[in-house]
Amino acid sequence: MEEKKDPRYLDLVISRKNDLLYPLIFQEYIYTLVHDHNLFPTILLENLGYDKRFRFLIVKRLITQMYQQNHLSLSAANLKQNPYFLYNKVLYSQKISEGLSIIVEIPFSLQLETSFKNLELVRVQNLKSIHSIFPFLEDKFPYLNLVSDGLFSYPIHLEKLVQILRYWLKDPASLHFLRLFFHEYWNWSHPSFEKKNLISFEKRNLRLFVFLYNSYVYEYESILFFIRRQFFHLPSKPFRFFFERLYFYVKIENLTEVFSKGSPVTLELFKEPNIHYIRYQGKFFFAYKGMPLLMNKWKYYFVTLFQNHFDVWFQTDKIHINPLYKHSFHCVGYLLSLKWNPSVIRSQMLQNAFIIENTMKKMDILVPIILMIDSLSKMKFCNKIGHPVSKPTWTDLLDSDIIDRFVRLCNKISYFYSGSSKKKNLYQIHYILRFACLKPLARKPKSSVRAFFKKLGSSFLEELFLEXQISSLIFIRSSPRSSDRSNQSKVRFWYLDIISINEIINHE
């Protein structure tokens, strides 16, 4: 007789089929994975005699040196006496971090692939901007009346992250290896983590950091979403009993059974609260439709969860609850505010005419021009008031290198901000970037920018500011009970090929 699996542990056991590939962590194939994925095209230092191309033979030599060294006996004196040893250590850390990021992403890639096996692709539609992947900003937010935003105040402790990862890693050797790697090699350059000044990583090598940070966020958000579903039923005292990760899903099942058996009539009277939660770059937002008293209760649950379980301190007086129609806030790189659009409709019935005035709420999504100009000024594209500037050293570059530098930046900005409701601020950014590109090009033939621009024509670099498109894949999930097409649910999967955070969009 086949043993029946307990469904209460389904969420905890689902990852065991595609468990982490621990042997890969201790094999040389980790460097092959990093090389094949091209995560670091140029990380070798020029002053050590290496060229800019990736040499697999160099990596093999570094692997041999890595096996011969004792990493537990590292000291600051050794690093100062031997700068080449410091470079090797940084190179080891980069390769280990990039290889680990690939390995830990393998189970999630397999789960994503299996989730689409039973889905039938209906169509692929193109959308004009990144803004289309946030339809709730237009569909949901205009009907809400309260918004609360705040920041994660203090960094995450490394041991707290190891404590969360111990539920995933069943191999003690791998867990000890990660703990050693965190404390010896890693420099948390992100404000969410504690910083160490021993080793400095490249800013672009954030793939492992993104995975670890999301694993931390997943833990508290899983509890947070459960509280949202049981918001009206969850009292204050039993709140602390839902924090243990191993028994969390079991308690959810038991609590659901108690509510369904004990008070079925009461459950029908309660309506699911219209609460929306957004997390973006260390910021969190709550949007709600209802009374401020209930929003204060939700704020209390959120602060208690972080302070008592995740050891993250919040200043409750800095978490404000504001009316949405009076408050604008920054989210996903945009400046969001609620705008009232008045409309007048004239209706005539027989000899009587009626004028109906109606006001509709619409989400106004703007480019944060002040923050954008500040970011461009730090990158030396303009001054503090937005006038384009140029460095004399840029004239030493080839024309193709100058244009290529601006092409990549303009494509990213146009791709990200083409979904703004007003294009005026975006056109101002286009103006700054275009003339910042023209100034170093005009200095080579020693002509003015106006004469150089007139020679090239007004269409110069216009193709760089075209609105890019993203794809939306629409699937149909087959219904096991009926083959009727009307009973089959559609699933929309948004595809976006921006996998790195742009410095100009990542506002500090």
UniProtKB/Swiss-Prot annotation:
Which keywords fit this entry according to its UniProt record?
Answer: Chloroplast, mRNA processing, Plastid, RNA-binding, tRNA processing
Q: Which GO terms describe its molecular function?
A: RNA binding
List GO BP terms, alphabetically: mRNA processing; RNA splicing; tRNA processing
Where is this gene product found?
Plastid, Chloroplast
The GO cellular component terms are: chloroplast
Q: What HAMAP family is this protein classified in?
A: MatK (MF_01390)
| Classification via PANTHER family | MATURASE K
The UniProt function text for this chain reads: Usually encoded in the trnK tRNA gene intron. Probably assists in splicing its own and other chloroplast group II introns.
Family designation: Belongs to the intron maturase 2 family. MatK subfamily.
Q: What is this protein called?
A: Maturase K
Q: Which organism is it from?
A: Marathrum schiedeanum
